[in-house]
Amino acid sequence: WGRGGRCVAAVGVWVQGGSGGGGWVGEAGLLVGAGGAGGAGALGGGATGVGGAGGNGGTAGLLFGAGGAGGAGGFGFGGAGGAGGLGGKAGLIGDGGDGGAGGNGTGAKGGDGGAGGGAILVGNGGNGGNAGSGTPNGSAGTGGAGGLLGKNGMNGLP
C-alpha cells in the first residue's frame, strides 16, 4: 500500500488504502479494508488560476469496509475552483465515503462538490460535498445511495 497505491493484501488482513494526492486513489485490500482518502486539489495560480480537482476516495474491500472520503477541490486563485473528489464505494458492509467540497473560485465559477459514495447492503450512503462559491457558485454534490439496511446520504450545501 502507499500513497495513491493499491493494496493487494492476503485475505482477512485489515488494510487502509493510501491517501493519494489530487487525482490519485488509495485502494483497500481486495476483500477487507477501508478505502483511503483522496488528496486535496492543488491551489490554482499562474496564467489560468484554476484550482486542481480533489482526488477520489478509494473503494473499500468487497466484504467489509468504508469508502474513502473525496478530497477537496483546490482554490482558484484568479480562476475557477476545482471540483471535489468523489466519495469511495463501500463494501457489502460499510458506509460510503463523503464527497469532497468544491473549491472557491475568484471571479469565476466555484467548483462542484463531489458525489457521496454508495453503500450496498448494511451501511449508509456518503454525503455529497458542498458547492464552492464563485461567479456563479458550483453545484452541490448528491448524496450516495444507502444500502438495503441504511439511509441515503445527504446532498451537499449549494
Regions found by a protein language model. Give the residues of each.
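Long, compositionally biased tandem-repeat segments
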Residues: W1-P158
